UniProtKB/Swiss-Prot annotation:
Protein name: Ferric aerobactin-binding protein VatD
Signal sequence region: 1-12
GO terms of biological process kind: aerobactin transport; ferric-hydroxamate import into cell; intracellular iron ion homeostasis; iron ion transport; siderophore transmembrane transport
Gene from which this protein is expressed: vatD
Species lineage: Bacteria, Pseudomonadati, Pseudomonadota, Gammaproteobacteria, Vibrionales
Induction record: Expression is up-regulated by low iron concentration condition from early to mid logarithmic growth phase. Expression is repressed by Fur under iron-repleted condition.
Tree of life domain: Bacteria
Residues noted as binding desferrioxamine B in the record, renumbered to the chain: W61, R77, Y118, R185, W213, F215, W269, F271
Main function: Part of the ABC transporter complex VatCDB involved in the import of iron(3+)-complexed aerobactin, a citrate-hydroxamate siderophore produced by other bacteria. Binds the iron(3+)-aerobactin complex and transfers it to the membrane-bound permease. Functions in the import of iron(3+)-complexed vulnibactin, a catecholate siderophore synthesized by V.vulnificus, in the absence of FatB.
Species this chain originates from: Vibrio vulnificus
Amino acid sequence: MLSAALAFNSYALDITHEMGTTSFETTPKKVVALDWVLTETVLSLGIELEGAANISGYQQWVAEPHLNADAIDVGSRREPNLELLSNIKPDVILISKHLAAAYEPLSKIAPVLVYSVYSEDKQPLESAKRITRSLGKLFDKEQQAEQVIAQTDQRLAANGAKITSAGKAEKPLLFARFINDKTLRIHSEGSLAQDTINAMGLKNDWQEPTNLWGFTTTGTEKLAEHQKANVMIFGPLSQEERQQLTQSPLWQAMEFSRTDSVYELPAIWTFGGLLAAQRLSDHITGRLTQPQ
């Protein structure tokens, strides 16, 4: 009996997160994630989720890693269903600081850990690595966590080398998501795109101030100042959006349009973690090294 008690107590684990330190006496099994980047990170460790926020949105925008089919949709990322969460009885709930207002009510349901990949630090890739290690410790998946981190570093470096050997590394990149025909978001400092291409040895042509998510909202006319860049458009664009864009006289006049230096990327969660960075890197590499 004594040896069993000692064994039980020896597992007690303190996890430090952005709103304190939480103790666990056993490895959490029923896990709920209310932020897509945390959903992605948990799944990357080979752990299935008991619940996740806005599952249809995750499947559309994040896509990989695939969410287990029996995961329960617990409501939106901004307003999770507290009653449903109470019924699930999770062992741990994972949120980002952007949901900090819900910390107290959620803490009445289960221990809550707060991790933010995107913040004023503007180092999402390093933050994602730190969080991956912390969750690896929590779920007794430390070896898997290190494998995910090493795989990310290796993939980004290898893709960068592939682009360099293809002679495509000198031309700077510009990452844009179109909001409408007059407005777009351009991703640079503090974005997943910026940290990913930094690790690949590539350059970003956009150097304007960004918000904590790593993008600048601006007018499409600003593209005229970046005509020598390879333009990466975050998709997917609808046929109507694509037609509206390509038929615009302004767009047609741009040097990057005339030199076929515009590339549409598939749905990639631009506010994701390490696996999202791998996917983004793969698609950038595929676009830049494909035969013209």
